[in-house]
């Protein structure tokens, strides 16, 4: 399994929201919805290509399925102007095009079109325009690239449109921050290409294998542009003189990097290489297996920690002696550089904090620099919404709010942080508010609202062309899994749904969020919900247990596979009971972690599945465990794959049960050497003469970005299920 497995799943922060299950009921929200009349008048079914070429809000964490890293509108310090970043795929050119739109705040209602300040296109897996920051009221900085260019940090003057490149690094710059005066930069960059097996020394003397990862030994020498955990850290002064900050830990652009306003310090989070033995006393049920995992010294772990960089000294050390809860890393500076606020960190074990659960969950804290004195703010799971420097108040938004007030404000009084009454009107300095609004049936639109008089207007309809397509209605449903727990998900009805007709079903995995408009599903690898529905296939997007956090207790245990399998089985029973599906024509898509869930169901369930897709994921297999030795394999299979534990592997691992699989399986793996993760399933299926189709995208990243690779994957899923689920004359001849 590629070493970015944990990083790939970090964005799975699910929210539960019960909505009535209405077949084709009336749908009313503040957003403009696709009505039944528009469905009937649609010109044609939507295709995978249509979904690739939609316009999207271009935020990395929004793309990952989580809370956006940046607000929809990035306001200038004086609030007089704001920027919106958008992206759109082009299948014909195989690029993703980015636009940076500039608006004047006082003209947002009168002239909502905006000015295109910058256009850039990417043929890589990176964003062409990202990490946009206002340096002052007239200047912004950003990370940008065009085809056949390395990404670098740029500065552009809003009025003169003069573009200046601030970095000239020899490799791709992947993350950065800049001081308030623009004189100090810190950035992460890809390392120079290092080959292990192809060097003259290796060919002459051989290689001693000890702590290398498999990917290093078998690397084909090709350039990589997917997010990997090998980045190097540099600081650069106003004279463009670079200095590297060395670290024995592992850096990636998927973790935050923040420079203090005065440029003296920086805070970032890293994957640590040396985990203190004492950290085994932390009790987080998901994180702990990676803390106690046996690893060779100096190798990558799946444990993250905040680090403090002294820019002047060129040194790095831990900010706190504690790990971070996955996916909760955010940083804010309440002063020029004397202290920093971070979210999601556990408290050091020697802290005086005696609160129940202090070892079980993360906290938001203020840390004084350089002494690392900790001031606790809250133990809730939150994201940083706003820092009010004038009042010294911070507003934090709950990550799992199910209703009511979702934000709380804290102020420091007499050296302690205390919650104070939250006022929505005082939570921002802006007269106008820019918001992205969407839900399961409402395509994203951007609205402008006057916070004083309540006036509200549509600023930008991202995809008015969607009204031309027949798009299936999505409804929320709950059901009982066969083991008794209750699950929530979303049903995609085929356009023109006929009551009483039983449809084939494809079960998509990896979560359901009713507040998001998903044409394909959570991500763009393998999933293709609306294009499948357009072919007359009902799609169920499976979410989590309705009891918040309950599923976490089963992760990396022998109960994980059976629990997820029972959710699939219960869904089939419920939809069959409602007369919606033909239970003899059911397919499954597993991606990333849920490839294991689907593989387990294919090999252990008594329910019969007609077809399946396993895409770029952990499958709980024996070969993968020998290659990458992750604790996940030992966790879900009940022990080590040798000695006494081998018996449990024979019973639980899908790899030893492939002879029981009756469904044709399509395998997809992305990136250099990642095909090895699917080789066991492919080889054993081939030996058993079972229908198997294996696709490898050599330069694909885990969450596919390039339009042609998305076509191969997502259209491949549509074609696969059309072939095996639809009862057509062509398919009957093919079978």
What are these regions (language model features)?
Residues 31, 35-68, 103-130, 156-174, ...:
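Multi-bladed beta-propeller domains
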Residues 70-73, 81, 86, 266-270, ...:
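Non-catalytic accessory segments flanking enzyme active sites
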Residues 73-81, 131-139, 176-184, 256-266, ...:
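Blade-terminus and WD-like Trp-Asp/Gly-His loop motifs, strongest in beta-propeller folds
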Residues 96-108, 190-242, 271-309, 350-365, ...:
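Predominantly five- to eight-bladed beta-propeller fold
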Residues 461-578, 582-584, 591:
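Cap/lid segment of the alpha/beta-hydrolase catalytic domain
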Residues 516-518, 611, 616-663:
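Mobile cap/lid helix-loop segments that gate and shape the active-site cleft of serine hydrolases
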Residues 573-624:
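Primarily recognizes the serine-hydrolase "nucleophile elbow" in alpha/beta-hydrolase
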Residues 689-735:
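C-terminal catalytic histidine-bearing segment of alpha/beta-hydrolase fold enzymes
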């Amino acid at each position: 399994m590629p070493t970015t497995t944990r990083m790939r799943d970090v964005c799975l922060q699910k929210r539960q929201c019960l909505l009535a299950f209405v077949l084709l009921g009336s749908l009313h929200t503040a957003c403009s919805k696709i009505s039944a009349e528009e469905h009937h008048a649609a010109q044609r079914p939507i295709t995978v290509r249509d979904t690739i070429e939609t316009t999207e809000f271009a935020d990395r964490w929004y793309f990952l399925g989580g809370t956006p890293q940046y607000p929809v509108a990035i306001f200038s310090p004086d609030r007089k102007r704001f920027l919106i970043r958008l992206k759109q795929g082009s299948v014909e050119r195989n690029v993703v095009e980015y636009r940076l739109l500039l608006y004047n705040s006082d003209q947002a209602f009168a002239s909502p079109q905006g000015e295109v300040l910058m256009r850039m296109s990417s043929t890589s897996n990176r964003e062409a325009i990202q990490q946009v920051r206002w340096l002052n009221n007239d200047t912004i900085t950003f990370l940008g690239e065009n085809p056949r260019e390395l990404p670098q940090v740029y500065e552009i003057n809003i009025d003169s449109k003069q573009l200046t490149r601030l970095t000239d690094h020899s490799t791709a710059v992947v993350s950065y921050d800049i001081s308030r005066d623009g004189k100090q930069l810190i950035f992460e960059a890809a390392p120079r290409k290092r080959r292990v097996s192809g060097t003259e020394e290796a060919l002459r003397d051989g290689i001693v294998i000890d702590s290398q990862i498999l990917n290093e030994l078998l690397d084909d020498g090709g350039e990589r542009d997917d997010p990997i955990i090998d980045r190097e850290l540099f600081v650069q002064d106003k004279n463009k003189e670079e200095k590297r900050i060395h670290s024995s830990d592992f850096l990636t652009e998927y973790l935050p990097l923040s420079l203090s306003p005065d440029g003296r310090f920086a805070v970032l989070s890293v994957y640590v290489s040396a985990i203190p033995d004492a950290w085994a006393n932390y009790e987080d049920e998901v994180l702990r297996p990676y803390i106690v995992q046996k690893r060779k010294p100096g190798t990558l772990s799946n444990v993250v920690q905040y680090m403090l960089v002294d820019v002047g000294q060129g040194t790095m050390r831990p900010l706190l002696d504690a790990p971070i809860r996955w996916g909760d890393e955010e940083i804010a500076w309440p002063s020029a550089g004397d202290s920093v606020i971070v979210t999601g960190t556990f408290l050091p074990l020697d802290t005086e904090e005696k609160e129940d659960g202090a070892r079980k969950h993360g906290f938001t804290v203020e840390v004084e620099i350089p002494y690392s004195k900790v001031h606790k703010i809250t133990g809730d799971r939150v994201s940083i919404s706003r820092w009010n420097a004038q009042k010294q108040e911070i507003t934090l938004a709950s990550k799992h709010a199910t209703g009511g007030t979702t934000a709380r404000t804290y102020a420091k009084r007499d050296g302690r942080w205390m919650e104070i009454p939250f006022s929505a009107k005082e939570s921002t300095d802006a007269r106008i508010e820019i918001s992205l609004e969407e839900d399961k049936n409402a395509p994203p639109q951007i609205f402008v609202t006057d916070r004083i008089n309540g006036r509200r207007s549509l600023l930008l309809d991202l995809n008015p062309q969607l009204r031309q397509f027949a798009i299936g209605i999505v409804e929320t449903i709950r059901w009982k899994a066969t083991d008794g727990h209750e699950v929530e998900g979303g049903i995609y009805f085929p356009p023109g749904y006929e009551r009483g007709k039983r449809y084939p079903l494809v079960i998509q995995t990896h979560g359901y969020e009713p507040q998001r408009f998903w044409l394909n599903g959570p991500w763009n690898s393998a999933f293709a919900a609306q294009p499948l529905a357009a072919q007359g296939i009902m799609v169920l997007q499976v979410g989590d247990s309705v009891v918040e956090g309950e599923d976490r207790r089963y992760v990396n245990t022998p109960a994980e596979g059976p629990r997820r399998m029972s959710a699939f089985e219960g869904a089939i029973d419920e939809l069959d009971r409602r007369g919606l599906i033909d239970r003899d024509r059911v397919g499954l898509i597993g991606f990333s972690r849920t490839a294991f869930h689907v593989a387990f169901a294919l090999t252990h369930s008594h329910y019969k599945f007609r077809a399946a897709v396993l895409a770029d994921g952990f499958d709980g297999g024996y070969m993968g465990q020998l290659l990458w030795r992750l604790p996940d394999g030992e966790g879900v299979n009940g022990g080590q794959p040798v000695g006494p534990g081998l018996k449990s592997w024979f019973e639980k691992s899908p790899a030893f049960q492939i002879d029981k699989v009756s469904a044709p399986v399509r395998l997809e793996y992305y990136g250099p050497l990642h095909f090895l993760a699917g080789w066991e399933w492919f080889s054993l299926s081939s030996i058993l003469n079972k229908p198997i189709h294996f696709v490898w995208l050599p330069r694909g990243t885990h969450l596919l970005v390039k339009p042609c690779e998305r076509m191969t994957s997502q259209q491949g899923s549509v074609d696969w299920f059309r072939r095996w689920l639809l009862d057509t004359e062509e398919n009957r001849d093919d079978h």
